Amino acid sequence: MEYIKKIALYMSVLLLIIFIGGCGNMKDEQKKEEQTNKTDSKEEQIKKSFAKTLDMYPIKNLEDLYDKEGYRDGEFKKGDKGMWTIYTDFAKSNKADELSNEGMVLYLDRNTRTAKGHYFVKTFYEKDKFPDRKKYKVEMKNNKIILLDKVEDPKLKKRIENFKFFGQYANLKELKNYNNGDVSINENVPSYDAKFKMSNKDENVKQLRSRYNIPTDKAPVLKMHIDGNLKGSSVGYKKLEIDFSKGEKSDLSVIDSLNFQPAKVDEDER
């Protein structure tokens, strides 16, 4: 009988050790899973925040934005229908110390159903030289860009009048399929960044290569940046960048943004 008791006690202790060890392993696995879920959930939150506007792409007729409302908060005055700001530029380093930046910004006022903005050409220099900046006023009527300023260069004039925003031909409804992004967060601002590797087979990449001079076969990186609350903020902004750059000293990228804010009355604020 005493022998059987010893065997039973031994088995009980052995089972207890196995159980405690198993619980410890389960806790470790749970911690790992929770940590993974935190990273994944933040990545998903960033993508979902962008999807609120990117799901509208492609916006072939920009005047459709007059009938679309974005995120509203306390910054909006009573009766203000808000304003969409759409922006696209192409940045390219021509030399080691020179960067050219060309694109357009358009402000679509939902109150007046009018769209005004400007086309810009900028050149930045690293050395002791001020940047060159030129702006050409434009407006949009019947989904057509109308140049308001006189432009002597016929090639530039054609680029302005035929300009298309990235949001007019891009299709990012499959954004959820971009996975394993590199996510960074600054809770103090707050700001959120996510990077995803793209493929040259991506239709959006093919579109950009057909529209811009991109002298590299390197597959780009999709960079997503948010300033402000992930749920939405009229004082924050979202920016999308498709980066073809080959190295740290090389700049080659397309930047796109579509944001909704209170309508601005003062033209100087733009």
Swiss-Prot record:
Lipid-bearing positions (S-diacylglycerol cysteine): C23
PROSITE patterns documented for this protein: PROKAR_LIPOPROTEIN (PS51257)
Membrane topology: Lipid-anchor
InterPro entries: Csa, Csa_sf
Subcellular location: Cell membrane
Lipidation (N-palmitoyl cysteine): C23
Signal peptide: 1-22
GO cellular component assignments: plasma membrane
Keyword entries, A-Z: Cell membrane, Lipoprotein, Membrane, Palmitate, Signal
Protein family: Belongs to the staphylococcal tandem lipoprotein family.
NCBIfam families tied to this protein: SA_tandem_lipo (TIGR01742)
Protein name as annotated: Uncharacterized lipoprotein SAS0403
Organism: Staphylococcus aureus (strain MSSA476)
